[in-house]
Amino acid sequence: MKPLIVNCHTGEDLYVEGVERMRKSAEELGYEVYTEEMSSKGSWTANCAFKPKFLTSCVARFGRPLVWVDADAVLYKPLEHLECPYIEFAVAWDPLLPFKSFASGVVYLAATPASHRILEEWGDACNKAVRGKSREWDQVTLYKVWKKMKDPPVTKILPQGYVKIFDHPWRGDELQVEYVRHYQFSRQIKRKAKAS
């Protein structure tokens, strides 16, 4: 069974249009998609920190493997790295950076206790970061939670083609196969907010 692609976004026009483009590209590849619009939590960091709470609600609602895909993304190829039945958690990272953070534009969670545990711990860590007014990104928090877990879920590190940013060059010598392209709408929204 293919995972259900899920996403939530804050409803700006760019995200509304983008999520429909993401949905269309995913459905053309045979994926089902579930999205929700949410109210802004006050900052980009706080909005991103809401991701594990949203994913937890999707786990309870759907009870099947899920893959978060950012609203500003387009799928170009089937997500073949997620078809292994033994993988419980999958995420990418930048191969040219120190291994201190994941890239959370695509996050896979199997329907297993171990993947639910990392999701719960990630949510707790994000809540603490937001309450403490930390500017730590959700992807850094996710990495720290995963690294500290005594018994982490069976993990697949995805190639950078799952989190390829449209205007960034390929990083390192890794095979250059683009599965998901990300358009970084938050950058455009921040620029527009500063200009007004």
Describe each PLM feature range.
Residues 49-102, 106-116:
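GT-A fold catalytic core of metal-dependent nucleotide-sugar glycosyltransferases
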Residues 1-64, 113, 149-151, 183-196:
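N-terminal anchoring/stem segment of glycosyltransferases
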Residues 116-196:
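Catalytic core and acceptor-binding pocket of nucleotide-sugar-dependent glycosyltransferases
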Residues 34-36, 67-70, 91, 154-159:
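A structural signal for short, well-ordered beta-strand segments and their strand-loop junctions
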Residues 3, 104-105, 179:
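Residue-level detector of short, conserved catalytic/binding motifs and their immediate flanks
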Residues 2-5, 87-89, 155:
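Hydrophobic beta-strand segments of well-ordered beta-sheets in folded domains
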Residues 12-15, 44-48, 97, 108-111, ...:
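Aromatic-acidic/polar surface patches that form glycan- and anion
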Residues 19-22, 75-80, 161-164:
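Short, polar loop motifs at secondary-structure junctions
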